[in-house]
């Protein structure tokens, strides 16, 4: 079944410009408060100019172009400008340092980079010291250094015509993007995403939020992340809605931005909810137009209830990962919700819980969450140049092994337990890190928490807790362990405590556990 009508991204943007014209498509707010607005017509013209820019620099269909940018209009221009000429975007996490960025450049085979001044010295070093295929750099925001192979993105773009000059044949099966996974436990893998994937993601995520063309979807999620691209941007554009992209999350500014732009949809991760809750309460907290807050794992019931009551919102839970493109399990529009369930399988997907022998399990039994989709259409196509890794998670008939553990109930609601790699084996018992973190997070002095397993010669693994305290608080080991003993089984109580100023996180707010082991 062809869900998207054979429409690739170039056709999508030409149609959107025709249908919605002068309606606002994109609003970008920088950390300094600078706001840029573009109508659907203007945005399509900027995309065309950017496509022409890349063509003048020698980029052709199938070439890879890396983007190392924070949230900004140029990211959107490049994303779709590359797609229009059949080239492939390789977004790089803007928080990555030299070694990690060089590794992605090498493994993606990117020949051109678009970045900003703050990252340029790092790439100068990479060009001098690392073997890459990079032959040109475009800078988005500064006067040019006196250096060969470097251009001003804005100057070159503004010299281009607003109509597309190069339009090679495109197929919805063509690769549009290679997005490298966050690599919280190992080296990142390049997830191959097609034009079909992105078009489907737009329709699917718009359905999940019941988006209309009068909606305003605001996000602070990084543009180089699958959530921003497929849950937010593609959904908003596919529905003809307005997409508001804020450069960076600020707990002090976020709720005001929701109110200022009259957002009807936004998305939050647990870190955002916890930091919003420690902001001073305001009489205007519930003065907003939000219909849904898209939510991603993981939060205790106490935290969820307090957030929803204070801000007068409801959470729409969505579960997915880069490889699934969208939230393939989640709450459905107009359907009942059952906290702490992560929802039910969405349309075009099947979901099962399987045991260690890949056999389906009945309701109530814990196993691996597995999803069935169509590679290159409703789930990712493959890992770039890594067939062994692809075969490890993706079966020939489209079943994807997520590596997450969970269970389902008799009505088809699924419940997340933990990442398999986050299960601690302690003296014959399996302990979920997420379960412990949700309990410990309810302590009134604790702002942030992660637990990890560390080697133990007697019990296989011991449990160590890393906590960040609320400002001005102190917490003794005696008080911490007493709280744990009162709220969890004895075998789950951590053996060690470390109090830190912060925890290592990636761009999507996930703890980088390998940095703590």
Swiss-Prot record:
Keywords: Ligase. Pathway: Amine and polyamine metabolism; carnitine metabolism. It catalyses: 4-(trimethylamino)butanoate + ATP + CoA = 4-(trimethylamino)butanoyl-CoA + AMP + diphosphate; crotonobetaine + ATP + CoA = crotonobetainyl-CoA + AMP + diphosphate; (R)-carnitine + ATP + CoA = (R)-carnitinyl-CoA + AMP + diphosphate. GO terms for biological process: carnitine metabolic process; fatty acid metabolic process. GO terms for molecular function: carnitine-CoA ligase activity; crotonobetaine-CoA ligase activity; medium-chain fatty acid-CoA ligase activity. Its EC number is 6.2.1.48. Catalyzes the transfer of CoA to carnitine, generating the initial carnitinyl-CoA needed for the CaiB reaction cycle. Also has activity toward crotonobetaine and gamma-butyrobetaine. Belongs to the ATP-dependent AMP-binding enzyme family. This is Crotonobetaine/carnitine--CoA ligase. The lineage of its organism: Bacteria, Pseudomonadati, Pseudomonadota, Gammaproteobacteria, Enterobacterales.
């Amino acid at each position: 079944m062809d869900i998207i009508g054979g429409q690739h991204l170039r056709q999508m943007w030409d149609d959107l410009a025709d249908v919605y014209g002068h309606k606002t498509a994109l609003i970008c707010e920088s950390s300094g408060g600078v706001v840029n607005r573009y109508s659907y017509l203007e945005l399509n013209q900027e995309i065309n100019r950017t496509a022409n820019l890349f063509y003048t620099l020698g980029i052709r269909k199938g070439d890879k172009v890396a983007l190392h940018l924070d949230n900004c209009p140029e990211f959107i221009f490049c994303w779709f400008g590359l797609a229009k000429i059949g080239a492939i975007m390789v977004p790089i996490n803007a928080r990555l340092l030299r070694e990690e960025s060089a590794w992605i450049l090498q493994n993606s085979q990117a020949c051109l980079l678009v970045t900003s001044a703050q990252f340029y010295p790092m790439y100068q070093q990479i060009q001098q010291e690392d073997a890459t295929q990079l032959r040109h750099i475009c800078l988005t925001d500064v006067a040019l250094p006196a250096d060969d192979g470097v251009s001003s993105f804005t100057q070159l773009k503004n010299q281009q015509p607003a109509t597309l000059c190069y339009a090679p044949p495109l197929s919805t099966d063509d690769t549009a993007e290679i997005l490298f996974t966050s690599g919280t436990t190992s080296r990142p893998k390049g997830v191959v995403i097609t034009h079909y994937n992105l078009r489907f993601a737009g329709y699917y995520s718009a359905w999940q939020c019941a988006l209309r063309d009068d909606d305003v979807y605001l996000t602070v999620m990084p543009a180089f992340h699958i959530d921003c691209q497929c849950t937010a941007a593609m959904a908003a554009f596919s529905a003809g809605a307005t997409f508001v992209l804020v450069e960076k999350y600020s707990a002090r500014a976020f709720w005001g931005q929701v109110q200022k732009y009259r957002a009807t949809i936004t998305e939050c991760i647990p870190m955002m909810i916890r930091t919003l809750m420690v902001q001073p309460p305001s009489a205007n907290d519930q003065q907003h137009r939000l219909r849904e807050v898209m939510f991603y794992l993981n939060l205790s019931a106490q935290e969820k209830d307090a957030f929803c009551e204070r801000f007068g919102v409801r959470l729409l839970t969505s579960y997915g990962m880069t490889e699934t493109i969208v939230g393939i399990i989640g709450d459905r529009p107009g359907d009942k919700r059952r906290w702490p369930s992560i929802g039910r399988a969405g349309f075009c997907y099947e979901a099962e819980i399987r045991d260690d022998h890949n056999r389906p399990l009945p309701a109530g039994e814990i196993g691996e969450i597995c999803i069935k989709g169509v590679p290159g259409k409703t789930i990712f196509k493959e890992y770039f140049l890594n067939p062994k890794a692809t075969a490890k998670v993706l079966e020939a008939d489209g079943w994807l092994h997520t590596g997450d553990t969970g269970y389902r109930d008799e009505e088809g609601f699924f419940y997340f337990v933990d990442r398999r790699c986050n299960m601690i084996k302690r003296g014959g018992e399996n302990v979920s890190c997420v379960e412990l973190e949700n309990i410990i997070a309810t302590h009134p002095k604790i702002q942030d928490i992660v637990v990890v397993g560390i080697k133990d010669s007697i019990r296989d693994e011991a449990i160590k807790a890393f906590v960040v305290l609320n400002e001005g608080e102190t917490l003794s080991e005696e008080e911490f362990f007493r709280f744990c003993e009162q709220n969890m089984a004895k075998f789950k109580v951590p053996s060690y405590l470390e109090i830190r100023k912060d925890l290592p996180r990636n761009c999507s707010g996930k703890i980088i556990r390998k940095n703590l082991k």
